[in-house]
Amino acid sequence: MPDRVTRIALDVDGTLSGYGGIIDKWTIGEFLKTAHVGIVSTRGDCHNVASEFGLGYACCAGVDKPTKADCLRDYAQKYPVNGGSLYIADTPHDFTQALNAGWNFADANHLRLNLGAGGDIHTGVVNIDARLLPNIDIVRDLEKDPIPFPDGTVQFIVMKDFLEHLSWRKVAGFMKQVYNKLKSGGWVFIQSPDMDAIYHSIIEKRDFHGDFKYRFETISYWVGGGQDYPENTHKAFFTIDTIHELLKDIGFSQTYCRNDNTNFQCIAKK
C-alpha cells in the first residue's frame, strides 16, 4: 500500500466514497456522483470545482481550511453520501493506481477479476485473457466459454477495452453473466470506445490523439481496433446512452458513465 494514500476517519455518521480516476481531471460533481455507487477510491487536490451537478464546492488546504483532512470532512458534512470509505492521495493517480490502492486497502480478500487483461496486469486480481501472455492467471476465450467462477462470488470486475471485442450478438448475454457472478453490492468497471465521441471527431475532422494525424488509419484504429492479432478486432459498438441502458435493463441498481476522450468509462453496482 503506497504511503501517499491515507485513510481519513470522518467525523460524520455517513462516510463518503468516490472514484478518483485521473484526479486533476475529475470534478467534485463527478466525484460525488460516483460516490453514490459506493466505490472506494481517491481524491487529491482542491481545484476540482463542479457546476454540472450543481455543487460548486472548493476547499484548499491552508487557505479555506487548515488541512486537507479538514477540507474532506467539511465536504462530507455538506454532501453526505451512503458509501464506503474516503481516501485522499497527495499525488494524482491514474485509474488503475487509484483502483488498486483503494481496493487493496479496503479488503484484500475480495475476489476481483480483470477480464481481457492483455498486458494490463493488476496485483491482487485474477487476470483472464484469451491468449497465453506473461502474468495471465487464466487463459480463456470468454466469447466462447463462461467466466470460471460461481455465481454470487465476485466483488469487482474490470473490463477495460474488452467488451467491444465480443460479438454484439453476445454482449447482452455476457453482461447478464457478469451480473450473476457479482455478489450483491458488487460492481463492474467498463471502458470501451465511445462511438458518439469518435463520430463527432470524424465529422469535425478533429485529431483523436496528439500522436496521430487525421488519416484513414486513425479512424480505422479507433473504430475497428488494432487488428494486429485475431482477438484485437472490435465487433460491438456503444455510446454512453446505449451502455447505460444495457446496464439498467440487466438489473444493475446504480450506474454512472462519463466520456474520456475517445472512450467512455462506466461503473455499475449490483
Feature map (PLM): residue ranges:
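Conserved beta-strand elements of the Class I
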Residues: 8-9, 86, 111-113, 126
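A short helix->loop->beta-strand "cap" motif at the edges of active sites that frequently abuts
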Residues: 35, 103, 186
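Conserved Lys-Pro-Asp/Glu-containing loop-to-beta segment of HAD-superfamily phosphomonoesterases
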Residues: 68-93
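S-adenosyl-L-methionine-dependent methyltransferase catalytic module, highlighting the catalytic core
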Residues: 168-270
